[in-house]
């Protein structure tokens, strides 16, 4: 879609128009997940989508070539107020997931989210109201340890992340929050039955030093797991 066509629809060409749409990559370790059935999201913080068809495209290209875009643009030209209203629940519903501050279109609403980004860019407020909202906080400490260990472990050992929900607050009618406990499972494929689950402290103070020290690796307390 040309600059002139975008200006005709939205009065301006936003700075993000030629930025690539990002894909949502699931985090190996979670700290918490909060969910809200009716929230407002800043469309300026929407960077991508879980839809596998669009990452790598620019927002301009999605506006031009999206599967349902012509229909949604036609509806927008008839009723732009749809993107400005303060309805408690937007219909059809739209769903967004935020990972560490970056937003992604989740289950539904990719084409409308694209239109909202362009339209609300020049409006007094960039917020889209009445949408489903999920916010994910990840465990950066365990994630960093996981990727370090993958480089250091012998080829016959494998590392598997595990995030287990330990508490959930879902007493409220329209929102809930879950908290997670994280461990890293190491399995030795040469020795059946030799595996172990580690929390961050033992990884930092025990397993990593053993992997970095040839003597500890061969004769230390983790010798059956690592050899």
Language-model features: locations:
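Surface-exposed, charge/polar-rich loops and edge strands
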Residues: 2-26, 35, 121-227
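A short, basic-hydrophobic beta/loop patch
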Residues: 88-148
């Amino acid at each position: 879609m040309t600059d002139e066509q975008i200006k005709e629809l939205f009065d301006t060409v936003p700075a993000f128009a030629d930025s690539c749409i990002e894909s949502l990559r699931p985090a190996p370790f979670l700290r918490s997940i909060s969910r809200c059935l009716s929230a407002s999201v800043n469309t300026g913080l929407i960077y991508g989508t879980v839809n596998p068809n669009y990452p790598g495209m620019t927002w301009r290209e999605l506006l031009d070539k999206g599967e349902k875009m012509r229909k949604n643009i036609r509806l927008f030209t008839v009723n732009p107020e749809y993107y400005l209203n303060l309805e408690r629940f937007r219909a059809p519903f739209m769903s967004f997931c935020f990972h560490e501050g970056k937003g992604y279109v989740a289950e539904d609403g990719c084409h409308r989210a694209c239109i909202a980004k362009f339209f609300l860019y020049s409006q007094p407020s960039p917020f889209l109201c009445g949408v489903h909202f999920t916010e994910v906080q990840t465990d950066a400490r365990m994630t960093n340890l996981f990727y370090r260990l993958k480089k250091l472990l012998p080829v016959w050992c494998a590392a598997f992340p595990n995030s287990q929900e330990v508490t959930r607050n879902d007493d409220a009618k329209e929102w809930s929050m879950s908290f997670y406990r994280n461990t890293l499972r190491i399995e030795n494929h040469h020795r059946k039955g030799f595996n172990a689950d580690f929390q961050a402290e033992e990884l930092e103070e025990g397993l990593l030093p053993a992997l970095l020290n040839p003597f500890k690796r061969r004769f230390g307390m983790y010798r059956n797991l690592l050899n």
